[in-house]
Swiss-Prot record:
It comes from Pyrococcus woesei. This is Uncharacterized protein in gap 3'region. One of its GO terms (cellular component) is membrane. InterPro entries: ECF_substrate-spec-like. Gene3D superfamilies: 1.10.1760.20.
Length: 148
């Protein structure tokens, strides 16, 4: 699901040789519902597969960055329907994702690549927090006992 969501909308970012996508929505949704192991696997492997198909130079970085994002979101969300805790997890996961990609873009492509990456990653993080985290919270309140 993460791979498909990531590939559905891909807007290239020439300065960083990456792309804007909405895979973070699915990463955060899965991590909220299923916890850190599934969230980390879905985030890392699902997103890296999308990169292998379209942007292979980013695949290894994506495996680590998006995997960490999923683990963080899942860890904060595991065993709770507390909105504040889920929100904190999605925000921290989003921050880690943005900082991870901006750092890699800076090393590989310099300040211009990092700036281009920053703005696009902010859009991805915010969409993931609002849509993925919000939907995850709503679903978990309704069907949480089935998933845990």
């Amino acid at each position: 699901a993460v791979t498909v969501t990531t590939m559905l909308v891909r807007i290239p970012i020439p300065a960083s040789q990456g792309y804007l996508n909405f895979g973070d929505i699915m990463i955060m949704l899965v991590a909220v519902l299923f916890g850190p192991l599934v969230g980390g696997f879905a985030g890392g492997v699902g997103s890296a597969l999308a990169d292998v198909i379209g942007y292979p130079s980013w695949a290894l970085f994506t495996l680590v960055i998006k995997g960490t994002e999923g683990v963080i979101v899942g860890w904060f969300s595991k065993g709770t329907t507390n909105y504040g805790r889920i929100l904190l997890g999605t925000v921290l996961g989003g921050i880690v994702m943005v900082l991870g990609y901006v750092s890699v873009a800076y090393v590989l492509y310099g300040p211009g690549g990092a700036v281009a990456e920053f703005y696009n990653d902010i859009v991805q993080a915010v969409s993931g927090i609002i849509i993925g985290g919000g939907l995850g919270y709503i679903l978990k309140k309704r069907i949480g006992p089935i998933l845990e």
